[in-house]
A protein has these predicted regions:
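Glycine-centered, small-residue-biased loops immediately flanking beta-strands
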Residues: 21, 45, 134
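Conserved beta-strand signature within the Rossmann-like core of class I S-adenosyl-L-methionine
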Residues: 27, 129-140
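A short glycine-rich, Lys/Arg-flanked "PGG" loop and its adjoining helix->strand segment in the class I
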Residues: 38, 118-132
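Class I S-adenosyl-L-methionine
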Residues: 147-190
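S-adenosyl-L-methionine
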Residues: 1-22, 26, 32-35, 39, 57-94
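Conserved SAM-binding motif I beta-strand of class I
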Residues: 46-51
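Mobile active-site "lid"/loop adjacent to the S-adenosyl-L-methionine
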Residues: 99-122
Length: 190
């Protein structure tokens, strides 16, 4: 049985993120990962969740409210490249995990999507804020215009990281369909 990339990402995050930790959902979308992270960090942890689009914030706010998790999350309507502008001073260097879903908000305007430049800026920022051990998970959806280019840029960037400080894993499912999503895991081991 094949495990979905989302499940693989969640398994990796679950093995790293503990109650009381700090996490980032860099692309909140419809709030599924934000909710997942909020459950893991518990009442004493915190999640910073980013998206540019108001419908994403509304959907995520409702999902968190319905699950009694809203108080654990800071919803931020801004680009994920601005993470450092919103992080509380006492959370710097304490981010245990961050999640990205690269692409566009399902069911919305497909012209509004993540871009390589801002994604790489966010990743570089997160590396400086990440705890050790720490984990960054990215699922790159490649079936839309620009999707494969962004995935390739992120993989190229990840493969340049110091092997003494980071362990990089890339999962690309055997072509069950054209342009499958790709999972990139970056683990801080410094």
């Amino acid at each position: 049985m094949t495990i979905s990339l989302v499940k693989q990402a969640h398994n990796a995050i679950s093995s790293c993120l503990l109650a009381g930790d700090i996490a980032v959902d860099a692309t909140m979308g419809n709030g599924f990962d934000t909710c997942f992270l909020a459950k893991l960090v518990g009442e004493k942890g915190a999640v910073y969740s980013f998206d540019l689009q108001q419908p994403a914030l509304e959907a995520t706010r409702q999902r968190l409210h319905d699950n009694g998790l809203l108080q654990r999350v800071r919803l931020i309507q801004d680009n994920h490249s601005q993470i450092s502008s919103y992080l509380a001073a006492d959370h710097i260097g304490l981010i245990r995990c961050a999640m990205f879903n690269l692409g566009y908000l399902p069911g919305s305007d497909k012209t509004i999507q993540t871009e390589p430049a801002s994604t790489l800026e966010a990743l570089n920022t997160l590396l400086s804020l990440l705890a050790s051990p720490g984990l960054i998970s990215l699922i790159a959806y490649t079936g839309h215009q620009g999707g494969q280019h962004e995935a390739d840029k992120v993989k190229e960037w990840a493969q340049q990281l110091s092997k003494k400080e980071y362990r990089v894993s890339i999962q690309i499912p055997q072509a069950v369909k054209q342009s499958p999503p790709e999972l990139i895991l970056i683990e801080s081991i410094k």
